[in-house]
């Protein structure tokens, strides 16, 4: 601090895990700020301080003590969370800033689980939010320890994605659907692994999201070809052509909505978040189709999936018309969670 010669300094403890957004927030403040977290042995703090001796208590044994001293002397203010921009567009959710002290292995494991849970998207499908997390967690933890790069997981997922298509077309449903579910789970694993290990890359994002956009209609064509026995004039294959058009139209609507509001159509309002749980997307359609195949209703399920895609696109069309030219800040209010805190609180007991 003394070497800073009056320049601002952000003080961190080596035994803490800090939210990168909090560091950026502190760096943009103009005065001394402190941020506290935890209780008892896990109480910790980070301090944004000017590099001058009058504001620095050299007798402080740790940053929490220093922060307390600065507050008592009026030399700093606590971080005002109303000024903190907690919305994460990529995750479609609000996360409060976090700061944790790693006191032992138990605390480390709790923090790791918190980071895992807080990296789930706020608006996503039922399978991703309720079915896959236990399996994804059991995969992400050892992969992180083994330092497996998330791009490796992404590439394995891509191989599974397109290897499933000829199996679908041949009516080899068991191996095809096995590969499909492997890809579906790995699609959650690579993103969580990248964010937890801070190894996200533009190339990985491109491969991951590019595959997500391209492969669903290819799968649907494969399903229809397998159901029809290779008859391009069959009703089910003709329905797959309609599915392609509706799918592309729906994706265009999602992009238009983001252009006109600055937000994802999937989390603009609470109703959008709820509907995203069951709207027509790959994971939901995959689960429905597999169950239908098991009871001999593959054709009926496929027609239902096409109809559900059409209803999803219609709802998105209504939302685009409804909010076209609207205020980009509209709908940004923080959603309250049951305990009265802001969604994404860093209280570990919530996870």
Question: Where do the model's predicted regions map?
Answer:
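Membrane-embedded alpha-helical segments that form the functional core of polytopic membrane enzymes
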Residues: 150-203
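Short acidic, S/G/P-rich loop/turn micro-motifs used as interaction or catalytic elements
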Residues: 15-25, 52-56
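Short beta-strand-to-loop acidic/aromatic patch adjacent to the donor-nucleotide binding site
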Residues: 4-17
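Short amphipathic alpha-helical coupling elements at transmembrane boundaries
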Residues: 137-145, 191, 195, 205, ...
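Conserved donor-nucleotide/metal-binding helix-loop-beta segment in metal-dependent transferases, i.e.
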Residues: 19-41, 224
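A short mid-domain helix/strand-loop element embedded in enzyme catalytic domains
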Residues: 129-137, 142-145, 152-161
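A feature for the membrane-embedded catalytic helix bundles of lipid/isoprenoid biosynthetic enzymes
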Residues: 41-47, 51-140, 209-351
């Amino acid at each position: 601090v003394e070497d800073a010669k009056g320049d601002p300094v952000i003080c961190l403890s080596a035994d803490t895990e800090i939210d990168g957004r909090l560091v950026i927030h502190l760096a943009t403040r103009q005065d001394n700020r402190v941020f506290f977290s935890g209780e008892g042995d896990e109480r910790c703090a980070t301090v944004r301080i000017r590099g001058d001796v009058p504001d620095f208590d050299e007798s402080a044994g740790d940053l929490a003590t220093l922060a307390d001293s600065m507050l008592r002397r009026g030399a700093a203010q606590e971080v005002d969370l109303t000024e903190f921009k907690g919305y994460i567009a990529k995750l479609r959710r609000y996360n409060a800033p976090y700061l944790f002290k790693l006191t032992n292995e138990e605390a480390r494991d709790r923090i790791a689980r918190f980071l895992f849970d807080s990296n789930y998207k706020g608006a996503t499908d039922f399978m991703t939010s309720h079915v896959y997390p236990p399996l994804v967690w059991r995969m992400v933890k050892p992969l992180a320890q083994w330092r497996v790069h998330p791009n490796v997981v992404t590439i394995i997922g891509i191989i599974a994605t397109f290897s499933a298509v000829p199996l679908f077309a041949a009516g080899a449903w068991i191996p095809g659907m096995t590969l499909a579910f492997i890809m579906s789970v790995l699609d959650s694993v690579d993103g969580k692994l990248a964010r937890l290990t801070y190894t996200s890359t533009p190339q990985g994002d491109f491969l991951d999201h590019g595959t997500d956009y391209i492969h669903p209609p290819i799968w649907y064509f494969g399903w229809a070809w397998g159901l029809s026995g290779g008859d391009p004039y069959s009703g089910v294959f003709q329905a797959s052509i309609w599915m392609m058009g509706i799918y592309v139209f729906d994706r265009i609507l999602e992009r238009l909505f983001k252009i006109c509001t600055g937000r994802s159509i999937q989390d603009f309002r609470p109703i959008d978040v709820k509907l995203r749980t069951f709207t027509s997307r790959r994971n939901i359609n995959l689960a429905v189709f597999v169950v239908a195949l098991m009871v001999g209703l593959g054709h009926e399920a496929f027609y239902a999936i096409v109809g559900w895609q059409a209803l999803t696109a219609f709802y998105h069309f209504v939302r685009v018309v409804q909010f076209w030219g609207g205020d980009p800040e509209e709908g940004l209010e923080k959603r309250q969670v049951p305990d009265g805190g802001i969604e994404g609180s860093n209280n570990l007991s919530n996870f």
